[in-house]
Amino acid sequence: MSASQLETTEPADIVGQLQRAASAEDFFELLDVDFDPKVVNVARLHILKRMGQYLASEDLDGLPSAETKARCKTVLERAYADFVESSPLDQRVFKVLKDAVAPKSPRRPAFVSLDNLK
């Protein structure tokens, strides 16, 4: 989505605009959130995933568009702040990163009953 498209879209349907956004930068521009491109370049997917996690606990149905946009902006700012202060490895938003540090369950030795041997 180009900058001109972002500016000409109606502000009433911010959720729809966010769903059509083509990049993390579009989210920041749509919601008027300042960001450091260096942080976004490293953690773009992590920031958007965390934003989604935070939004899951928000009830946006039936809210006026200005309130919806304000809540989305607050959630994006919170998600972005998580990655300004620490790295994606520290935050472990994605399952693959969580699994990398999960304690391994002890492996049971293979057991074959003598009755099964012939």
Curated annotation (Swiss-Prot):
Is Magnesium set as a keyword in this record?
Answer: no
What family name appears in the similarity comment?
Belongs to the NifW family.
- Note the subunit structure: Homotrimer; associates with NifD.
User: What is the protein's name according to its record?
Assistant: Nitrogenase-stabilizing/protective protein NifW
Q: Which UniProt keywords apply?
A: Nitrogen fixation
Highest taxon of source: Bacteria
Which function does this protein serve?
May protect the nitrogenase Fe-Mo protein from oxidative damage.
Which InterPro entries does this one have? NifW
Where does this protein have coiled-coil stretches? none
The signal sequence is: none
